[in-house]
A protein has these predicted regions:
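Alpha/beta enzyme core
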Residues: 1-5, 12-32, 36-154, 166-177
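Short acidic/histidine-rich active-site segments
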Residues: 162-163
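Active-site neighborhood of phospho(di)ester-bond hydrolases with catalytic His/Asp-centered motifs
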Residues: 156-158
Length: 178
């Protein structure tokens, strides 16, 4: 996969060409994912370059703007048989998951509404993880995860899982993370 923040170093077309080259030499099905796409034009460029799935990340936007941005990408991607992941709530950075507490966690109500409004294929949710290195032990809100899983029918995705521990990851999978 390729995240938008890495595109200045490795361009979208170049990443797609490399993966296509090795995919042709392989007898395996290969997926190519564009992660944390913030810019609509770059996400569309990844789709056009042959990425098989994309993530549109409007999680820092107000809910309505995130919905609108996601709907635009879902319509574009689905016409081209590409799956779309989106994110609501906010996955912190480093130790910010301690500071933000429950205020940035995904709620079951917004998860349900978001999925219904956008027709997204999978949903990244915030349950207490953070990108980067943890300062201390992360405290995942498994009760919130169960509540979200009960409300939505799409696969749930966990970002910031690295460093959260095998036990936390296993429990998250048991409760609905794919």
């Amino acid at each position: 996969g390729l995240a938008e923040v890495h595109t200045p170093t490795l361009g979208i077309e170049e990443a797609a060409a490399i993966v296509k080259y090795y995919a042709q030499k392989s007898n395996q099905d290969i997926a190519l994912h564009y992660d944390h796409g913030f810019t609509i034009d770059l996400v569309k460029k990844a789709i056009d370059a042959g990425f098989t799935s994309v993530m549109i990340d409007g999680s820092s936007l107000p809910f309505e703007e995130n919905v609108a941005k996601t709907k635009e990408i879902v319509a574009y991607a689905h016409e081209r048989n590409v799956t779309v992941e989106a994110e609501i709530g906010h996955v912190g950075e480093g130790d910010s998951y301690h500071v933000e507490g429950n205020t940035m966690l995904t709620t079951p109500e917004e998860a349900k509404k978001f999925v219904e409004l956008t027709d997204v294929d999978s949903l990244a949710v915030s349950i207490g993880t953070a990108h980067g290195e943890y300062k201390g032990t992360p405290h995942l809100n498994f009760e919130r995860l169960q509540e979200i899983a009960a409300e939505v029918s799409v696969p749930l995705v966990l970002h910031g899982g690295s460093g959260s521990g095998d036990e936390n990851l296993s429990k998250a999978v048991e409760l609905g993370i794919c």
